Amino acid sequence: MTYNSVSHICLVVPRHPEVSGGSTFVRNLAAAFRNHGLSVRVLSVYPGHPLGGDSFSPAADETDTIFVREELHRRPVSEGRPPWRAAPLALFKRWDRWRQLSALRRTMATLPANSVVIFTHVLGKMMVDESGFQRSPTGPLFVGQHHSSFASLEDEPWLREALPKHFADCDAFVALSDEDAAFFGSLLDVPCVAIPNPAPEGRTLTTQLAKRAVALARFSHEKQIPLMVRLFAAAITVPEANGWSLAIYGDGVERPQVAEEIEHSGMHTRIQLAGVVDDSATALSDASLNLLTSSLEGFGMTILEAACSGIPSIAFDCSEGVRSQLEDGAGYLVPASDETAYVEALRAAMTNDEERARRADRALTRSRSYDASTIAARWLALFDTLFPMDPPAPSEESSTAQARPESTHPCASPGVPSPRREA
């Protein structure tokens, strides 16, 4: 199949590059689109954090930031300042915001007509709307996304209002699993489809010989890293688990709680805060297990990254995205919130090398279904259902007509047109 309808992709993201599952998704998908011959541009709402090594080259040079002065725009200027200092800063903030959003509006207006703008989070679409950009009937497609599960909206209730409001004029919405696509479809009046994350390429298989577990995560409440420390400390109390250690890679607001839990566990010689690593392949290079303890997870990017290196993961059954990667023995899937079962699964993985190796093989085999080229092709196939394959030349009569045909995607309701952009 060939894809002639799209030549340019613009990814609008909250922050990029950085060490996170969402940023990894952007890197992998951008590389896959380029391999299909498309040009890719990344717009980051806030500044990213430069990554070392080859983990983002060459796309780092193609990332533009909307708000360079993040601290100025993320909080009220009156916070912690006397009025005589806040007043002039407020004027500067208004001017700077107008200037940056004007630049964003010009950027959107100059995108080629056969472009697709992918908003990986509603925040990016909110900025485009605030800029005053008006969509043209012949302008690019808009595709929304929420790079987490539908259940995550419970933790951020403002999203329930923001998503339907700002994604109302999108041509489609992409979720990470069929289950989430159905849930988001009940909230959004746009066609909702499921496309999982693409796998990283060029990973080296591990030997499965080291008694070493790893975790790669943002230290936020839904990742439950303090709980991970407690569960690992409980699992290694049996003699059969002698020699096993855990390296936790990442950082975040709960770092003090994680450090305190490690100290409280009495296992600080076997549980280590390993800092931030730019490339997950480095952290996984000598690991035999990958751990997740998330209560909310849209897909679980580290599960896929570990599987590509032949490493099985242990995780709670917190979403279809996680379940689809680990079920049928492709890892260790633990009933949601069942801490006892998690400890038992962890002990079983550490003490049965043959079974762990079998699950590692299944994880590796399943990871191939998320091949980056295959996932990119699914995105391109979606675009082809939204773009007319041979759009007619614009005429005076057709310039006021609808720019897109009725949606032919199976997620669209019969007889219900897909959302249209304002002329």
Region locations from a protein language model:
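An aromatic- and histidine-rich active-site surface loop
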Residues: 96-105, 116-137
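Nucleotide-activated donor-binding/catalytic signature segment of Leloir-type glycosyltransferases, i.e.
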Residues: 259-275
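Aromatic "clamp/platform" in nucleotide-sugar-dependent glycosyltransferases that forms part
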Residues: 276, 295
